Amino acid sequence: MPLIDMPEFAGELLEEFAARRTSRVNTPVIQPAEPFLDMAGEDLRRRIFMTESETGESLCLRPEFTIPVCLRHIETATGTPKRYSYLGEVFRQRREGASEFYQAGIEDLGDTDIAAADARVVIDATAILQRLLPGRSLAVTLGDQQVFEAVVAALGLPLGWQKRLVQAFGDMAQLDALLESLVHPKPMTGLDARVAGLLATGDEAVLVDYLDTVMQETGYSTNASRSPLEIARRLREKLALAATRLPDESFELLKQFLALQAPLPQASQVLGDFAARAKLKLDGALSAFDKRVAALANAGVDLETVTYGAAFGRPLDYYTGLVFEVVEAGSDSVLAGGGRYDRLLTLLGAQEKIPAVGFSLWLDRIKAVRGSDKP
């Protein structure tokens, strides 16, 4: 299949990136697979094109740019703050559309003014789209994983359940299934008798050895799946979580929170009212939320065009705070999306914590909207 043609508006994109004082970065198409498998989430994991080197190293075709850009930043020991831009192909298995397509975007690393940096990426994404799609009305949906994490923590759930719920944030079907299993827990079934016995003993090392042996005997490749250690730990976690029940009151509060939605000018009041009714201490998360709203307003953003959704997230595990998407008003086709990922660079090997936020533009979708203007 031929590669997708470079979009005709690529020059305008590069002009926008230069005007925003970004450094354009190129990253290899072939990437080490492990960072994506570990940190990008199940949704992207299923879409990755996998391969391996002659030495057996797991590799993949570049499925997105954020992780490669961060890895390059770490490898080159570049100081911060630093703003990177990119324009290139990504490769994902998709039900609709080509599996190879262009993305462009900006990654903003190291700015310690979190609210200002968050506001800037939303403004940059919408401003670039307004140039590429003149006369089109845009709508922004904004969520906040930090607020969701604060609600889950304030409810006093075990850390294992907090982690699972946070990982499912943004996927309502998965969240609903998890909440149902919390309210009506079911014992683990269908386990190999030997695995069940080893789980009962709590001997992780022996369980890992057994799983490794079984995987080798059956030819089950760890290049396309989890390692024996990962599987063992997930099984142990599932066993512990299966014994946990969420009180009805906490379940109702979570459902109420996830149903919250409001135009951004009213969102702070809506969240504050919820916290007061639920008697949950969310001060830190709500303060950060309020600062971001103020930064957007101070930058001249029409807050009425932005909708806050408490359940809104994006299907990538590395987000930690702001998440957002931009669509043409009246459409559900995402033209730009991004968010904050403050833990990612440390997980990838950075020696110090580097706050980070960014966004990607879906160029094939932008091209389709531009094409719809033509007679």
Curated annotation (Swiss-Prot):
Keywords of this entry: Amino-acid biosynthesis, Cytoplasm, Histidine biosynthesis
Subcellular location: Cytoplasm
The keyword Amino-acid biosynthesis is assigned to this record: yes
Any single Gene Ontology cellular-component annotation: cytoplasm
GO molecular function: histidine-tRNA ligase activity
Source superkingdom: Bacteria
Gene Ontology terms describing biological process: histidyl-tRNA aminoacylation; L-histidine biosynthetic process
Pathway(s) served: Amino-acid biosynthesis; L-histidine biosynthesis; L-histidine from 5-phospho-alpha-D-ribose 1-diphosphate: step 1/9
Gene3D superfamilies from the UniProt entry: Bira Bifunctional Protein, Domain 2 (3.30.930.10)
Primary site of residence: cytoplasm
NCBIfam families: PRK12295.1-4
HAMAP family (alphabetical): HisZ (MF_00125)
Family: Belongs to the class-II aminoacyl-tRNA synthetase family. HisZ subfamily.
Note: This function is generally fulfilled by the C-terminal part of HisG, which is missing in some bacteria such as this one.
Chain's role: Required for the first step of histidine biosynthesis. May allow the feedback regulation of ATP phosphoribosyltransferase activity by histidine.
Protein's name in the database: ATP phosphoribosyltransferase regulatory subunit
Lineage: Bacteria, Pseudomonadati, Pseudomonadota, Alphaproteobacteria, Hyphomicrobiales
